[in-house]
């Protein structure tokens, strides 16, 4: 399954590959064949990058799930930061059930998402009003293709694990944790959107 709004990318690279193949067959020029193989590789890469595998999120009102696939790069100040490398699935999911209170897009720079100054990068901040309080999900653009795509609107009711958007080609997602939750992950952990529990309500035992 491909991510939402990825069809134009796939159509573009497939069309380009078809053009180079036709030109290579008709001309037999080595350079054109080289361009064909490069575009074929690009086609496979784009399809692989925009993959959107099915995920099953357990029903749990006392759990918060990772909003992104990747590695936990920081856990501090009631915030969990997940860095998504280029090989990770880039579709993001809501960490908790609730209603979308606001979506704010902020312009900024395009430093690598793991850089200490990436706090100034372009970002989209989604505030979700849950039964446990407000949760901020911040999608931060990286250094490559700088596009944050949102699948949701203000007023939407979300269920934990529901898709909320994606960031293209390397990025980071930060999630704030309510005070009545204990953080259940640590720096270096590999997490999966909608599947890995990153926080749980205090005195609540997560079922394995």
UniProtKB/Swiss-Prot annotation:
Database matches in Pfam families: PS_Dcarbxylase
GO molecular function, one term: phosphatidylserine decarboxylase activity
Active site: 171 (schiff-base intermediate with substrate)
UniProt catalytic activity: archaetidylserine + H(+) = archaetidylethanolamine + CO2
Cofactor-binding details, from the entry: Binds 1 pyruvoyl group covalently per subunit.
Cofactor: pyruvate
Its job: Catalyzes the formation of archaetidylethanolamine (PtdEtn) from archaetidylserine (PtdSer).
Name listed for the protein in its UniProt record: Putative archaetidylserine decarboxylase proenzyme
HAMAP family in the record: PS_decarb_PSD_A
Gene name tied to this protein: asd
GO annotation, cellular component aspect: plasma membrane
Subcellular location(s) per record: Cell membrane
């Amino acid at each position: 399954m491909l991510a939402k709004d990825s069809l134009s990318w796939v159509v573009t690279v497939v069309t380009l590959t078809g053009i180079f193949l036709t030109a290579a067959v008709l001309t037999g020029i080595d350079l054109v064949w080289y361009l064909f193989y490069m575009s074929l590789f690009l086609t496979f890469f784009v399809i692989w990058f925009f993959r959107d595998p099915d995920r099953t999120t357990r029903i749990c009102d006392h759990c918060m799930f990772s909003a992104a696939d990747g590695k936990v790069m920081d856990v501090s100040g009631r915030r969990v930061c997940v860095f998504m490398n280029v090989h990770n699935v880039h579709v993001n999911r809501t960490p908790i059930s609730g209603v979308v209170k606001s979506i704010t897009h902020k312009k900024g720079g395009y430093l690598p998402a793991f850089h200490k100054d990436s706090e100034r990068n372009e970002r989209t901040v989604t505030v979700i009003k849950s039964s446990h309080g407000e949760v901020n999900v911040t999608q931060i653009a990286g250094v490559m293709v700088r596009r944050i795509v949102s699948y949701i609107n203000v007023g939407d009711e979300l269920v934990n694990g529901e898709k909320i958007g994606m960031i293209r080609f390397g990025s980071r997602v930060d999630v704030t944790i309510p005070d009545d939750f204990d953080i259940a992950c640590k720096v270096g952990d590999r997490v999966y959107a909608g599947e890995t529990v990153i926080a749980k309500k205090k005195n609540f035992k997560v079922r394995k």
